[in-house]
Amino acid sequence: MSSNRRHIPLVLAAACSVAGALALAPTAQAVAPLTATATYNCGAWGSGLATLTAADSGTSKTIKITSTAITMPAGTSADPNSITTTLKLTKTSGGVTSQVQFSGKTNPGMSGGSPITLGPLKLTSGTLAAGDSTNSVVLPVPPSATNWSLQIVASSPTSATVPCVATSNQSAPFVW
């Protein structure tokens, strides 16, 4: 048997192993666009444009929120991973509208005047299938404990519950 023929079983085994691993690996799902902007009113924390960044790994759907217009008030601070954030979005699926929520406790350390960075927040309420779209839950001002689209609950060292309302739809809805 020639040297090349002896390697054929090894090459076939390696190719089958790679194909099997690829077949079992979770695939990244597309969400478009990856970023969108919307305006939020967060009372004492400020009002203005926020950037929402979406991701779909195939096993987890997330949204990260950043804003230079919405900031921690002077004299306050937050330790890393001490802010619980919940974001409500309107979901449209096959012409039917409902709500989903993204929530998490992921943030860098922040102090008074710092722009907010919240998340990534994981999908925690509702489901999203391929082709579903999500957009801001636009509500009237002022935000309150029962009237909010985005809720920020800081716990350390400053304790505060900050309800926010979206005052605009996203620049483009996310299509999952």
Language model features with spans:
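Secretory targeting and sorting signals
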Residues: 1-30
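Primarily mature extracellular domains of secreted and cell-surface proteins
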Residues: 31-176
